[in-house]
């Protein structure tokens, strides 16, 4: 083609023929990427880096002045020095005053920059050149997320304390309290973020597909079959989907129906499973009539249209906080059976019911087997976890009409004015802070202790995995979720049924107690104590005494477990300092190998146990029970 003689191709366009920014479906620059939000996001993340890397002994800031319980620190790096003020709490926790942080270079203060700080620390972090760029991208994405929350989530703690369940869920701003890069979401673009990030609180529709039964695993609780479940979840759409298959000349009874994350369908399934789609083994059916809201875990959905219906959890092949967030078809094959076994155990022991501890069961699961990847890959791989889903009970049937729900992550939430939701919730309840905390510990800590000591059973008890049931702000029940992937039986003395063998975990005996001391004390209570100390009348010392009281009372009620209490001593002087950020820094593609949970763990010496101070008065055999007030 001769462009010089083809005038039509050279005809200039007028400005009116070009799309304008206003006409675009999405803005080219997100509104939250403004200097004030970006600076605030960096200050927040620099504060967290200084806190958590000090806790994990990656850095060692030095005290240069002390005054009235506040220490003034400096961290000298190669070409700059960071200065900040903080209170030192138990478990080597620095509660840093965000406004006190400054960085000086060549005698001049510089803007706080989380990316710059990570790069300056890269030798101390010990990351490979291969992994570092991905980690930096995760840091940037975490800053992006924080800036969004600063711009769009200005709900005061006092308002959130009385808000509905899904408003609170979307109002959480921190994510995992320990991890620095906790909002990576590698794979989402700007528009995906607006649609699929939990903090966007978007109402969205799931994609539904039909998958051929002979290539798919479906499992469910006894007495529940695929058609019964899907008729309940889909309503009239179930019949419409069957009619659609018939119109295509397909036998409806040769297929299961499966929900898929819209991003997963667009970015992964439509391409990676193209052969299956072309052969008619996977058939697109349409979008759900019901609307859903993404939960904090980013791949779980709450049904907004019919809240009594199930949560839906789907595979989502984005990299987020050390894992590709897929779901294994192999795991789906026994997930309901594991849930049934755990629920039967919990429900058969009256102690759990007395404490108000309830399991939200995953009642059914489905997984499509991509034969090529399963044949080609012998090791665990994200490519074998792209197309699965499960259904989990809604929390609504477990509460009374006057009761409300709140993610336990909310207890660590602090609003943009540094006001804690926990303090607002306690005030709303009308209870004293001490009484509120006692009731909370009875609901949360006591059942976890009983599961550990009586059954060698552990959960993943971080805030996002638990739902508080509140009555006028008073905690009355607690709901535990994410059972199939997160529960384990540690060095169990009794053989497990074949269908739940996956729960059995063998590990060094000295590491077993870490499931209490790390997961609860270090990852939850380390943050809870300073909030109570600063914003309620419960001091840090009083909080740890309440924890010690709870342990003492539990052990006194179960003297038959005395040997276990001695073997796994909750009042011992110290425990191993397990470093979660170091684990992510070591391998941010897959932090933990589920086949060998200890292999990737990273440690940094010991850490003093706050309960050691109560050994003489509270350890089993020494207890003197306080009269109930």
Curated annotation (Swiss-Prot):
Function text: Ligase involved in the biosynthesis of the siderophore putrebactin. Catalyzes the ATP-dependent head-to-tail dimerization of N-hydroxy-N-succinyl-putrescine (HSP) to give pre-putrebactin and subsequent macrocyclization of pre-putrebactin to give putrebactin.
Name of the coding gene: pubC
Annotated source species: Shewanella sp. (strain MR-4)
InterPro entries in the record: Aerobactin_biosyn_IucA/IucC_N (IPR007310), IucA/IucC-like_C (IPR022770), LucA/IucC-like (IPR037455)
Pfam families: FhuF, IucA_IucC
Biological processes per GO annotation: siderophore biosynthetic process
Keyword check for Metal-binding: no
Pathway linked to the protein: Siderophore biosynthesis
Recorded family membership: Belongs to the IucA/IucC family.
Enzyme Commission (EC) number: 6.3.2.63
Keywords associated with the record: ATP-binding, Ligase, Magnesium, Nucleotide-binding
UniProt activity-regulation remark: Requires Mg(2+) for activity.
Name assigned to this protein: Putrebactin synthase
